[in-house]
Design a protein with these regions (language model features):
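Helix-loop-helix hairpins in multi-pass membrane proteins, especially solute transporters
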Residues: 74-78, 82-215
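Central cavity-lining transmembrane alpha-helices of secondary-active solute carriers
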Residues: 61-79, 125-132, 323-336
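Membrane-interface helix caps of multi-pass secondary transporters
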Residues: 15, 19, 37-55, 59, ...
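Helix-breaking motifs and short loop linkers at transmembrane-helix boundaries and internal kinks
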Residues: 53, 85, 106-112, 123, ...
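Transmembrane-helix exit segments and adjacent C-terminal regions of multi-pass membrane proteins
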Residues: 2-16, 449-511
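12-transmembrane solute porter fold
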Residues: 23-37, 42-43, 271-439, 463-471, ...
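Cytosolic juxtamembrane N-terminal segment immediately preceding the first transmembrane helix
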Residues: 1-37, 50
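Hydrophobic transmembrane-helix bundles of small-molecule transporters
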Residues: 172-287
Length: 511
């Protein structure tokens, strides 16, 4: 086995003919492409619905299965890293995503598409982690999470806006939703080819066997999340409790949760350790993430209803919003790094700034719900929203790392992902959708001299107003709440060899 390299930053898996200065940039580019990929792309939703004759809820369900798939590999990532080489992992992830994209174009079954989207999301995170974990010393030579996470979220959260923007334009140019799938299939094959040519197999430690991995636990938690997403995604379509599928899935949720909980409590190496749930500040942290998702879910229902149903903007017109969101995300992530590393201010004040940005979005949208609004007027509110979301996601992830020891941190990321990766967002979207329908029906029933457009405007303004009140109350709570890191000196990321030895001791001791 080759010796572990010491000294300046190196990438020993790279072949000698690759210039050292561009080696880390190659992996950053690979991570960028991985984050663009998926199983189904929401930007092509109207074309997918028309071509496959399926409902909007079906396409949304397929997309959300991919989002859930992205969340589930976290507890397995280091086990994969210490069993396979970087070359093997990247080639496998790229080929798996390429296969899923190709199969999605020729599959008409919604359940199969959901499965393919989940698998694509699973390998998407595996590929991204393997790329960025190998350049972290280049990104921060001191293994500082307060530098690494803002830069990481520039790619991860930023590409959540770039991917639909690219999808909309490719679909418009080629007049087919296949365009993005072919583009991502080609991008993944390009990654596999470049990794095959530019790298070689390199191990920095003796490989660990893939034993004691709780695959069934992963399946149970995934099934639970998918069932919850199903309920609130299809709730309006089935008229909630009136639909038999809704009642069946509602019954399945506690059953699945029971089996997942019992497996977690009674096996030696569970998917999520019971101890990971016992940190006293974890529940408030999850509550803050849920709050952000509540405020951030208004664009999916209220803003889209306003721009499409009232202003009648098309997909190409509103695609510019994705670029504004991308700019807000980059600025928010960089602001977190500036706040922590340069200003060295409290976490509470940072989260307060983020919440003020989210509140600014809601207030501006409340005031702007008028017919005849030009599209440029929405740029500042959208920028404020994504700026605030980026602050919350980045700062709270840093705080989570401070809260939990490293052996539980990646489990914590999955637990946080239960909230931020589609589940709570879908719940909030379902609530907003039901509330909007209720307010529209109520305003029509009042027999006021309003036409349909005016009724929609009044209903939207009512819901934006309620959200403003909720955000204002929470802002007041933040102003009197003090959140500081668990320790004065923030932790550093351990070396991968140290993590590997820790995992080996845990496996040998049976703990």
């Amino acid at each position: 086995m080759p010796p572990i390299p010491t000294g300046p930053f190196t990438m020993p898996m790279m072949n000698g003919f690759v210039p050292k200065k561009i080696q880390p940039w190659i992996y950053v580019f690979f991570a960028f492409l991985f984050q663009l990929a998926g199983g189904m792309y929401a930007g092509a939703m109207p074309h997918v619905m028309g071509d496959m004759c399926i409902m909007r809820e079906d396409v949304t369900m397929i997309v959300l299965c991919g989002v859930i798939g992205v969340n589930m590999p976290f507890p397995f990532l280091f086990r994969f890293k210490f069993r396979f080489t970087n070359r093997q992992l990247l080639i496998t992830a790229a080929l798996a995503i390429a296969a899923c994209n190709w199969l999605c174009m020729y599959t008409e079954s919604v359940p199969v598409l959901c499965l393919l989207s989940y698998v694509a999301g699973f390998f998407k995170l595996c590929g991204t982690f393997e790329c960025l974990s190998n350049v972290q010393l280049w990104m921060t030579s001191k293994r500082d999470f307060t530098i690494f996470f803002p830069l990481l979220y520039c790619i991860v959260v930023g590409n959540m806006s770039l991917s639909p923007w690219i999808t909309v334009h490719l679909t418009y140019i080629f007049q087919s939703w296949y365009a993005m799938h072919w583009a991502m299939t080609g991008a993944m094959l390009f990654i596999a080819l470049m990794v095959y040519v530019l790298t070689h197999d390199f191990r920095f430690m003796k490989p660990l066997p893939l034993i004691s991995l709780d695959w069934l636990g992963c399946v149970l938690w995934s099934a639970l999340l998918i069932e919850i997403v199903f309920l609130f995604n299809y709730g309006e379509y089935y008229n909630w409790w009136d639909g038999r599928p809704f009642r069946v899935v509602t019954f399945m949720v506690p059953v699945t949760f029971y089996f997942a909980l019992q497996r977690m409590r009674h096996i030696r190496h569970p998917y999520i350790a019971p101890e990971a749930w016992l940190y006293k500040r974890l529940l408030p942290l999850l509550a803050v993430f849920a709050l952000v998702e509540l405020i951030n879910s208004t664009p999916k229902i209220l803003q889209n209803t306003f721009t499409s149903g009232v202003l009648h903007f098309g997909a190409m017109s509103t695609s510019v919003f994705y670029l504004v969101e991308w700019a807000g995300t980059i600025c928010g992530c960089m602001f977190v790094m500036f706040w922590i590393k340069v200003l060295r201010q409290k976490f509470t004040r940072l989260l307060t700034v983020g919440l003020m940005a989210l509140l600014a979005y809601e207030v501006q949208m409340y005031l702007m719900v008028t017919p005849g609004l030009d599209i440029e007027s929405l740029f500042i509110p959208i920028f404020c929203r994504t700026f605030g979301v980026a602050i919350f996601f980045t700062a709270l992830t840093i705080y989570l790392e401070e809260l939990m020891p490293f052996q539980h941190f990646f489990m914590g990321l999955t637990m946080v992902g239960f909230i931020r990766n589609g589940v709570v967002d879908t719940i909030c979207s379902g609530i907003y959708s039901f509330s909007l329908r209720h307010h529209i029906a109520e305003n029509f029933a009042r027999a006021m001299p309003y036409d349909a457009t005016q009724v929609i405007l009044v209903s939207l303004k009512q819901l934006f107003g309620v959200t403003c009140i909720i955000a204002t109350v929470v802002l007041l709570i933040f102003l009197v709440w003090d959140i500081q890191p668990v320790r004065d000196t923030l932790k550093r990321m351990p070396y991968w060899s140290v993590v590997g030895r820790l995992l080996r001791r845990q496996m040998s001791s049976g703990k």
